[in-house]
Amino acid sequence: SEDAEEAYAQRVGKSYRIDMTPYLAYVTASDEEYLRLVNQTHLLPSDYVPEDLTDSIHTRKDGRDTQQLRLYAAKALEAFLAEAAEYGHTDVTVTSAYRSYAYQNYLFNVYCDNERKAHPDASDAEIEAIVLTYSLKPGMSEHQSGLCVDMHNLPSANISFGETAQAKWLA
């Protein structure tokens, strides 16, 4: 309803160009499950898989066919990208979302292998320290929660997003 949207706008200090009504239940989730701290000291167990994973319609077409998020996160992302589109930013896409423990383990090991090739004299601890500057061990990644996305509008993840018009709008 209009009253609910107005109350939300007042609470968050923002007004929106899109009609937020269909998204309000998703962007104001009160379930503690959506307030989960995941990092190097608060790990997810290896068998943790969110039950409500759903495909994101905003997946970048140069990687996996689909990216998944928890339902509320997917709907909140949909609202965010709809609002971005109202400001002319239509090219931001999801490059990574949910990752299983096993997939995060695979990625971390691939990154370690790549760094070993680049730094053949480095110890395992040094290699791990390098990789930990841009990736995390399995269980430590917010991606496993299904609540996290990586996204950008660049042809390569090696280019800085920070100076783009989209990043300035986001800030």
Where are these regions (language model features)?
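Extracytoplasmic cell-surface/polysaccharide-interacting catalytic and binding patches
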Residues: 1-97, 101-171
